[in-house]
Amino acid sequence: VTILINGLPLVQIELKKRGVELKEAYNQIQRYHKTSFHGLFDYVQLFIISNGVNTRYFANNPNGGYKFTFNWTDAENIPFNDLSKFAYFFFDQCNLGKIISKYIVLHEGDKCLMVLRPYQFYAVERILERVQNSNKNGYIWHTTGAGKTLTSFKAAQLVSELDGIDKVMFVVDRHDLDTQTQSEYEAFEPGA
């Protein structure tokens, strides 16, 4: 199934029967990449794979591997595994448009697309809400390897686009973290 947005094929869905492993759907997409849909897949931003009871999404990055497929969750981190629950939120016109237009990042260094995971999406949304509607402070907590740099980059990028925001500062407590963050930001967007 291909979803067109403004006439462009931006989302491709691979559906399998109940009981079929999701990795089969993922592998099918990889075969399509290699043998069938070269031109079409140049436009696709997101892939969805489902067997009805398990549903995952991932960015169009043929070198990413199955480990970069993710469950969608609600803001309380409850997964939407069932296709109908996933579709109800994810394919809502506003949500799908927002995910594609704001929450996919081209990693310039690796020349690959990255899509934020649900907790990153909700964290950035809460940061934007807080900046727009409050003068109170706040914090976002991530564990090691959870994508803190990508979350902070996307939050800084979107906050900087808000009216009345002239500068976004990123404060770190170690020199090596400053170097690492600057390098990653530069890979996400040169000059960031």
Residue ranges of model-derived segments:
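ATP-dependent helicase/translocase motor core
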Residues: V1-G191
